[in-house]
C-alpha cells in the first residue's frame, strides 16, 4: 500500500478512471452488438436505425475525448458496411 499523499491520490485517480473507462467500453460494445444483431436478423430498417444511433453516440464520444477520431470512424465505417450488406436492392 502507498504511504505518501501523491501515491494515494494516484490510486484514487486510477480507480475513478478505471470505472469510467469500463463504463464507456461496455457502452461501445452494447451499441455495436445492437447493430450486429439487427444485421444478423436481416432487418435492414432496424439495422439502419441502430447504426444512426451508434453514429450519433460515437460522434459524441469523439467530442468528449473518449474515443480517438480515427478509432470511432473506423468502427462507424465497419458497422455501416455491415448494414449496407443487407440493404434491399431497389
Curated annotation (Swiss-Prot):
GO MF term list: small ribosomal subunit rRNA binding; structural constituent of ribosome
Protein name, per record: Small ribosomal subunit protein bS20
HAMAP family attached to this UniProt entry: Ribosomal_bS20
InterPro entries linked: Ribosomal_bS20 (IPR002583), Ribosomal_bS20_sf (IPR036510)
Protein family membership: Belongs to the bacterial ribosomal protein bS20 family.
Keyword Hydrolase: no
GO cellular component, one term: cytosol
Pfam families tied to this protein: Ribosomal_S20p
Record-level GO BP terms: translation
Source organism superkingdom: Bacteria
Chain's role: Binds directly to 16S ribosomal RNA.
Gene name per UniProt: rpsT
Record key words, sorted: Ribonucleoprotein, Ribosomal protein, RNA-binding, rRNA-binding
Amino acid at each position: 500500500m502507498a504511504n505518501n499523499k501523491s501515491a494515494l491520490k494516484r490510486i484514487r485517480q486510477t480507480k475513478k478512471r478505471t470505472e469510467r473507462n469500463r463504463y464507456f467500453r461496455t457502452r461501445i460494445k452494447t451499441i455495436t452488438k445492437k447493430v450486429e444483431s439487427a444485421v444478423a436478423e436481416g432487418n435492414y430498417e432496424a439495422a439502419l436505425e441502430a447504426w444512426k444511433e451508434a453514429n450519433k453516440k460515437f460522434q459524441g464520444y469523439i467530442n468528449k475525448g473518449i474515443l480517438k477520431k480515427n478509432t470511432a470512424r473506423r468502427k462507424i465505417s465497419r458497422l455501416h458496411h455491415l448494414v449496407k450488406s443487407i440493404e434491399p436492392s431497389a
